[in-house]
Amino acid sequence: YTQVGPNSNWYFGNLAGITFNSGSPVALTNGALTTTEGVATISDNSGNLLFYTNGINVWNRNHVIMTNGAGLLGDQSSTQSAIIIQKPLSNNIYYIFTSDNDAGPDGIRWSEVDMTLSGGFGAITSNKNVALLSQAQLSSEKICAVRNCNNQDLWIITKDWNSSVFRCWSVDPSGIGNIQTWSATG
């Protein structure tokens, strides 16, 4: 069970959570999140909670909605409403990628969190709800992040709605890259 690091703390469901910092799972009851499906949580490399989201609101480590942290365009009923990644080679910048529900009009978007803001509690910057897909490119509720073979950069991967098309974006130290399309998976 030992899992100290960015995935040490999980918040989900109805005010529920688990921490793995002690070596065994321990229930947490201090969260502010209430959601039926998708969530994302991120901690620092020492296992200290940074923030968590249901794809709509972002709570800081004190379980208070962070500055500019309301109004993300994910959907709490989306099976994967959000994922959080750390910007490669940055100690303080994180990206939240959100996914709308069932081919909804808000599609796949990203927002930037700067942990140096708001006294170290973090804030969403002006890069909030930036669209990755046009409304004509409806996405499913699926989104994931995969480490690049260079062991530094990442790929964000989504699947189009009712289609075999997968779309990928690279994330490297310069930010979020151009769209790449993979298709015909069968």
Region spans (language model):
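Asp-box/WD-like beta-propeller blade repeats and closely related beta-sheet repeat scaffolds
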Residues: 101-155, 159-160, 184-185
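Beta-strand-rich domains and repeat architectures in extracellular enzymes and scaffolds
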Residues: 1-53
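Short consensus segments that form the blades of beta-propeller domains
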Residues: 29-33, 40, 72-74, 97-104, ...
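Hydrophobic core segments of beta-strands in well-ordered, beta-rich domains
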Residues: 9-13, 43, 50-54, 91-101, ...
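Active-site-surrounding "flap" and adjacent substrate/cofactor-binding loops of secreted or lumenal enzymes
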Residues: 27-28, 49-82
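Beta-strand initiation motifs
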Residues: 4-6, 19-26, 66-68, 116-130, ...
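Structural motif
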Residues: 16-25, 58-62, 102-114, 162-170
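Structural signature of eukaryotic scaffold interfaces centered on beta-propeller domains
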Residues: 1-4, 33-48, 73-92, 133-153
